[in-house]
């Protein structure tokens, strides 16, 4: 199977998982990226089964609207049963690295509201230790150099992602060469740097369920 076929299979598995638990009042949190796009396309086949969605990026909002799915502001929604999103890496505890698509801050906010966070990914994303994928950090533009110096002190090698402005008007530093043995601690350390909006570690609030697309089929993992 190609990587796209694996993503498609795992996206369909996520729809199959949440669909029986949705009703006409349900609002679904939807992530950003190529795997999330497959989820949106599969979810759109059942758009009469739920009320609408909260999007974690402008790109996701446009794709949802293109399918005729109502998109709500998070501030107008009191609860989200599910948030479904992809990841760049996951460990066995379902701590994640996200943010390759630069939507990490809104993704983290929507995940924080959701009762159940379902991560969908192809099998290559499950790793023993996080950090081979560079860790994205969203930064207030004027603080970029200051934050980069602090990230070097933490052992990282930050690189400015040129030409990228987030939906919030900020910039991204991608931090290479981190061996992330304690994701919860590192997430807090980086977020404590003045000028950081948030970083791509989803460890304080990890995924609740990881659906993994493999050649043998979709595997379902809960945190160890």
From Swiss-Prot:
Assembly and oligomerization: Homodimer.
Family according to the record: Belongs to the ribose 5-phosphate isomerase family.
InterPro entries cross-referenced by the UniProt entry: NagB/RpiA_transferase-like, Ribose5P_isomerase_typA_subgr, Ribose5P_isomerase_type_A
Binding annotation for substrate: 32-35, 85-88, 98-101, 125
Reactions catalysed according to its record: aldehydo-D-ribose 5-phosphate = D-ribulose 5-phosphate
Pathway(s): Carbohydrate degradation; pentose phosphate pathway; D-ribose 5-phosphate from D-ribulose 5-phosphate (non-oxidative stage): step 1/1
Superkingdom of source: Bacteria
Catalytic residue list: 107 (proton acceptor)
Physiological role: Catalyzes the reversible conversion of ribose-5-phosphate to ribulose 5-phosphate.
Recorded GO MF terms: ribose-5-phosphate isomerase activity
Top class in the EC scheme: isomerase
GO biological process terms, semicolon-separated: D-ribose metabolic process; pentose-phosphate shunt, non-oxidative branch
Pfam family, one: Rib_5-P_isom_A
Name of this chain's protein: Ribose-5-phosphate isomerase A
Keywords: Isomerase
Cellular component GO terms, alphabetical: cytosol
EC identifiers of the protein: 5.3.1.6
